[in-house]
Amino acid sequence: MSTMTPAEIVSELDKHIIGQDKAKKAVAVALRNRWRRQQVAEPLRQEITPKNILMIGPTGVGKTEIARRLAKLADAPFIKIEATKFTEVGYVGRDVDSIVRDLIEISVKQTRETEMRKVRSKATDLAEDRILDVLLPQPRAVGFGASVEHANDDNNATRQTFRKRLREGQLDDKEIELDIEQPTVGMDIMAPPGMEEMTEQIRSMFSNLGSGKKQRRKVKIKEALKLLTDEEAAKMLNDEEVKTKAVQNVEQNGIVFLDEIDKITSRNHEGGGGEVSRQGVQRDLLPLVEGTTINTKYGMVKTDHILFIASGAFHLAKPSDLIPELQGRFPIRVELDSLSVKDFEAILVATDASLVKQYQALLATEDVALEFADDGIRRLAEIAYAVNEKTENIGARRLYTVIEKLLEEVSFAAGNHAGQSVTIDAAYVDRALGEVSKDEDLSRYVL
């Protein structure tokens, strides 16, 4: 679990997302409250439930990006799903219980990786020993006494020399033959609605049939070291302990990001008599959000302390169009602002992995130095903003389209400009995009 303070979380989010301070603060406080709750003594700890968040804002302003970055910071099981993927129980489609099943799978993988990192050093030593056994087989005892001891001493000295060379990477390209455990290949079985548990049991039964088989393979030492390290680390893990920790991690620290929640409101589907009931999906989500117990292949999982963050553009619907019970389960409401020209400028240059830095790095691979003048950045931002206003407002995603069109010729002919510098100023932007951005019909299709 992350032990970062709210200020530190916001500072990290600022490196990747421009503006939206209210949303960042709400998410940072919610994440910090997970840690605070763990410091509270029982039985009060059980009574403290997370305050779920509803993020409201147009598309392309950072709702999903905040969730994505939060996942990396949280160091906790995290899943992002679209609410539109789910249907009411009884209809063809996924039911909402699969959210928790997917989350526990993520947690098991995360916990396994954490536990494997703890034993990796020891596993690497054992993997090196197995490789050295192939390169330098143990000498057979032919003589007696001193001669055998002398042979063993020589072999140990040689092994140490080879181990040093192995660690320095001098033997990486040498090929050896090894018996390597085969990874189990899962079977894909289509699950009928409501029978996911039975399908999961059948799948695990079939996957266990092939486990433990070894195959003799010829591999390079670099790859062999990785395969054997993973194999040795897996042997050291206690699977039951991993499952228990994973379930506990989901129950105490799990985060579910429900995207497009506005698309399952009744306002969005008025008059659709033959449609799957969206209100039914809301009613199915309700017990999950307020706390229930879901049966998974790793055991029973309680959802009482899982944090739910929902988001939606709410163009056609309002948060009040959600069923009242579900509205009450998202007490923290945060509105995200539409992006201004200044925001677009900052998105282009101010973030850690800004679009400008990405394109500069891509063209640098072909020895083309791409320079952006301040007036060029300003003009790009103005065009992106203007096209959003005139056509459909897709937020920051418009910048991808605009900059891709702008650099189309440079990217295509990069090989001919090796060793040269290309400066993008306002005049260059106007030449490349001026006509397209002014013509509304053209910009609808091109930008």
From Swiss-Prot:
GO biological process: protein unfolding; proteolysis involved in protein catabolic process
Alphabetical UniProt keywords: ATP-binding, Chaperone, Cytoplasm, Nucleotide-binding, Stress response
GO cellular component: HslUV protease complex
Gene Ontology terms, MF aspect: ATP binding; ATP hydrolysis activity; peptidase activity; proteasome-activating activity
First and last residue of the signal peptide: none
Subunit structure: A double ring-shaped homohexamer of HslV is capped on each side by a ring-shaped HslU homohexamer. The assembly of the HslU/HslV complex is dependent on binding of ATP.
Protein name (Swiss-Prot/TrEMBL): ATP-dependent protease ATPase subunit HslU
Biological source species: Burkholderia thailandensis (strain ATCC 700388 / DSM 13276 / CCUG 48851 / CIP 106301 / E264)
